[in-house]
Design a protein with these regions (language model features):
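Membrane-interfacial terminal anchoring regions of lipid-handling membrane enzymes
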Residues: 1-485
């Protein structure tokens, strides 16, 4: 009997090992096939194990100095501080999975995006990216319109690179945390000021930057609540620039601006409620918000099953020319010898310039163009001919100023019809006679979408800005003047 049990146990063990080997072989083959199919650049360091990255961080001398300083200032033992550091490392460090990113993630992303949007990807000059050196350190910097941005940009660039994003705490919930980490993203506590945490985060960001991991940074540090571009945050980019203390990295570093816009942002009403709550208006409780989300999901599921589903218009991405950082480092040769406040001031200037480049690349989709015309006219009833004329005037002005107008060759009536369907669906605009009535309860949505392109509108910008129905944001946008650098 005992011999039979041992034979059975051995057979199970051999079968388990064989199955594990087979699964491993299948995953490796799937990963290789995915890379060959997309011909994307996947940084070697991205495939390093979490254990090896953790060991490098725990043996980092700068983190060791931060541990001793924290222990001295808080009267906590160094052992307890090291334990906290280990928790931070486990929280931050991802585990990239090629199969998850390309075989699973790409297909799901493509299906979801095609379900909700018609996706447009435009390159300022595609050949510039092909000419980047293989050992270049590339950081994609972008504006932040929606939480769908992560999926949209990853999908748009899947044939070129696999991006590691800095993701906020909102995604640290099952299963989002596991998904983002499998895709190589790392988590950031946006408003956490503890120096020890930032020492760990800085060293991790610099470690992956030195190793050539391609990163994506939302330069505004969070979603725009009023539709305008926000002033840039410098923290993560300052960490990235820190590797240039070694001058051999300076010629290899590039920033690539990316601009994003939508005909409909999925969470626009939630963002407007957050903006209103800052002005003292009551914000719905968690149960009310959950009820609204469930209603939204149920309503759209019913529309999908009834075959009455309609997409939410365009989701557009413009990829700009790579910006080499070597000239900037040459012009700021004393950067790393300056006191920290002065150094951060120089970094802020760089971020402002990059944000201006992003602003100039923002795609103009039909709904923002129509909303800008509606807000510019500022009427409760707008004759169709008047609205079309103003949209055409704005489009011509945008093209003269090198604006990225999506499908600008179309007749303006075709562009408006695409916007009108969405505005009707959102209960913003209702047809009446030979024109349209603007419904007052959704006037804020008009401003939200008009604000996304207001800075591009040249002679029309001042009137659009003056009729904004949204409360002024704390910390004015760098584009509030309407000027594009």
């Amino acid at each position: 009997m005992t011999r039979t049990v041992w034979i059975a146990a051995g057979a199970v063990a051999i079968a388990t090992i064989a199955a594990a080997a087979g699964v491993g072989w299948y995953l490796r083959r799937s990963g290789r096939r995915a890379l060959l199919r997309f011909r994307a650049r996947v940084d070697r360091f991205k495939l390093a194990s979490r254990k090896s990255v953790r060991e490098r961080l725990l043996n980092d001398s700068a983190i060791g100095d931060a541990v001793r300083a924290h222990a001295a200032s808080t009267n906590i033992t160094t052992e307890a501080v090291w334990k906290r550091v280990d928790e931070y490392v486990r929280e931050i460090v991802p585990f990239f999975n090629v199969v998850a990113y390309y075989q699973v993630g790409y297909r799901i992303a493509g299906w979801l995006l095609s379900l909700f949007y018609k996706v447009t990807v435009d390159h300022e000059d595609p050949s510039d990216h092909d000419r980047l050196p293989r050992n270049s350190v590339v950081v994609y910097v972008m504006n932040h319109r929606s939480n769908a941005d992560y999926v949209l940009v990853s999908y748009a660039l899947a044939g070129r690179v696999a991006i590691s994003y800095a993701v906020g705490e909102w995604a640290r919930a099952f299963p989002l945390e596991h998904i983002f980490k499998a895709f190589g993203s790392y988590f950031v506590r946006r408003r956490y000021r503890e120096p020890l945490y930032h020492a760990v985060l800085e060293r991790y960001v610099q470690l992956i930057t030195r190793e050539g991991v391609t990163q994506g940074i939302f330069l505004e540090g969070g979603l725009t609540r009023d539709g305008r571009l926000k002033s840039p945050k410098i923290g993560l980019l300052d960490y990235v620039l820190g590797i240039a203390r070694d001058p051999t990295y300076q010629p290899r570093m590039f920033l690539v601006p990316i601009a994003i816009n939508y005909d409909r942002v999925l969470e626009d009403r939630s963002l407007l409620r957050e903006l209103a709550s800052r002005e003292g208006r009551e914000r719905p409780g968690r149960f009310a918000q959950m009820r609204e989300v469930l209603h939204y999901l149920g309503w759209n599921a019913a529309r999908l099953l009834a075959r009455r589903w309609r997409r939410y218009g365009r989701a557009a991405v413009t990829v700009g020319r790579p910006v080499p950082l070597q000239p900037w480092f040459a012009a700021n040769a004393d950067l790393f010898m300056l006191p920290k406040p002065e150094r951060l001031g120089r970094v802020q200037q760089l971020c402002d310039e990059v944000m201006a480049r992003i602003g100039a690349l923002v795609p103009v989709t039909p709904v923002p163009l129509a909303c800008a015309a509606i807000q510019n006219l500022d009427r409760d009833f707008i004759p169709r001919a008047v609205l079309l004329e103003r949209m055409e005037e704005m489009r011509n002005a945008l093209l003269e100023l090198n604006g990225r107008v999506i499908r600008h060759e179309r007749d303006i009536e075709q562009t408006f019809d695409r916007a009108r369907r969405m505005l009707h669906m959102r209960h913003i605009l209702v047809a009446e006679g030979d024109g349209f009535v603007l419904l007052p309860r959704n006037r804020e949505l008009v401003s939200y979408y008009a604000n996304s392109i207001e800075h591009l509108l040249g002679p029309f910008a001042a009137a659009v800005r003056a009729r904004d129905a949204l409360p002024a944001m704390l910390g004015a946008s760098p584009f509030a003047s309407g000027k594009v650098i």
